[in-house]
Swiss-Prot record:
Gene (name only): Gja6
Family: Belongs to the connexin family. Alpha-type (group II) subfamily.
Protein name in UniProt: Gap junction alpha-6 protein
Membrane topology: Multi-pass membrane protein
Side of membrane Cytoplasmic, spans: 1-23, 100-151, 233-286
A Gene Ontology molecular function term of the record: gap junction channel activity
Keyword Disulfide bond found: no
Length: 286
């Protein structure tokens, strides 16, 4: 479970940059998939090949029939599914960290530029306005959440889309390989079996229950992804149409003095003493 805990810790870091649906999806992934895979499901399939027997003594027949019945173990397929559906979220987290790092660099650069501009008198405002092209679009806070903007929004939507695609793809793979139920007897006619033989699976009913449970969890995750995708699209369109004129651009440094007048072009503030005061880094989420 230590490896799964590391994955869970990474996914937990995405929560501040996710919607409520994304947070629920992470809980569903960890509680109903990772915990079960690491405990009950793994133990249920521990005797999968050892207890697979066929009514023949022909050497190699059981191995060939087992390979035909289960090209890949259910547990290993579900592990791959967890990894694949987690990758888009982790890539979104990497993009978030990249943007944060770039903003930190921009903040340091502008702090140095503003210090120089402060001592250059009237040229300070002109120097400051040179950086308007570097300003990032900010989001305002609403109900404790953060509004996604620009490329981060596109990355988040892409991560939801690919998670949905992977969910459907793995469901189709599972259905194509061995369906969603297991029978107690598997009929095999593969060579080197001398004739048609019957092979017997261990605990087929228990495994079928787990298979159906994982199927339900996959479908719930898919529905959550679809709902979240439409929600994010709706909010993005609504914010674009309703708040287009109210969007602000700001410098990634902290506003310190209150007795200042804001510029109409950017959230850059010029004080009465001609001192340039940096403006705070607003988040790119709401």
């Amino acid at each position: 479970m230590s490896d799964w805990s590391a994955l869970h810790q990474l996914l937990e870091k995405v929560q501040p940059y996710s919607t409520a649906g994304g947070k629920v999806w992470i809980k569903v992934l960890f509680i109903f998939r990772i915990l079960l895979l690491g405990t009950a499901i793994e133990s249920a399939w521990s005797d999968e090949q050892f207890e697979f027997h066929c009514n023949t003594q022909q050497p190699g027949c059981e191995n060939v029939c087992y390979d035909q019945a289960f090209p890949i173990s259910h547990v290993r397929l579900w592990v791959l599914q967890v990894i694949f559906v987690s990758v888009p979220t982790l890539l979104h987290l990497a993009h978030v960290y990249y943007v944060i790092r770039q903003n930190e660099k921009l903040k340091k650069q502008e702090e140095e530029e503003l210090k120089v501009a402060h001592f250059n008198g009237a040229s300070g405002e002109r120097r400051l306005q040179k950086h308007t092209g570097k300003h990032i679009k900010c989001g305002s806070k609403e109900h404790g959440n953060r509004k996604m903007r620009g490329r981060l929004l596109l990355t988040y939507m892409a991560s939801i889309f690919f998670k949905s695609v992977f969910e459907v793809a793995f469901l189709l793979i599972q259905w194509y390989l061995y369906g969603f139920t297991l029978s107690a007897v598997y009929i095999c006619e593969q060579s080197p079996c001398p004739h048609r033989v019957d092979c017997f699976l261990s605990r087929p009913t228990e495994k079928t229950i787990f298979i159906l449970f994982m199927l339900v969890v996959s479908m719930v995750s898919f529905v959550l992804n679809v709902i979240e995708l439409f929600y994010v699209l709706f909010k993005a369109i609504k914010n674009h149409l309703g708040n287009e004129k109210e969007e602000v651009y700001c410098n990634p440094v902290e506003l310190q003095k209150p007795s200042c007048v804001s510029s109409s072009a950017v959230l850059t503030t010029i004080c009465s003493s001609d001192q340039v005061v940096p403006v705070g880094l607003s988040s790119f989420y709401m």
